[in-house]
Amino acid sequence: MKKLSALIPALLFMTVFTVNAAWEQPTLGYTLSPLSKPVEAPNFKLEDMDENEYDFSEYRGKVVLLNFWATWCPPCKREMPSMERVYQKYQGDNFTVIGVNQMEDGDRIFSFTGSLDTRPTFDILLDSESKVSQAYEVRGLPTTYLIDKQGKIRYRAIGGREFDHQEVEKIIQSLMNE
């Protein structure tokens, strides 16, 4: 009985912590803010975790969901699965997703993506000096831009989103049909 009474506070703490941890998860929205006037997306060259270089200009002709994120960012982690789902759904239709990680190394990103239920298959690029995020005027993470086939930024979202929500998918389909 003495062992059980000593165990009860620990079990109570673990239960309360688990419930509160789930309760405190950031909610994800689904709205994207249209830019009043589309602007040219800044071009950049970045490497992925395997040191392969990507030139953003090579994505011209595709609708691009460009997401700035970091492993320490809870809403970034929460929105990753929805980015993968929308990528899988539309990738063959002139659409792609690019994740631009902020100031973290490839080993940390590899470990993080490996811990997710579904490992992302879209391109993840490293902005180790945060120069690309500065060019895109990123002020908080996650920040996402939806770029049309002509390379113009058309929509922006600051904070976590469910990118496979039907409202977001309508926007993506609309841009793909232009």
Residue ranges of predicted features:
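N-proximal helix/coil linker or "cap" segments that precede and/or mark the start of modular domains
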Residues: 19-43
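Conserved redox-active cysteine motifs that mediate thiol-disulfide chemistry
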Residues: 60, 68-85
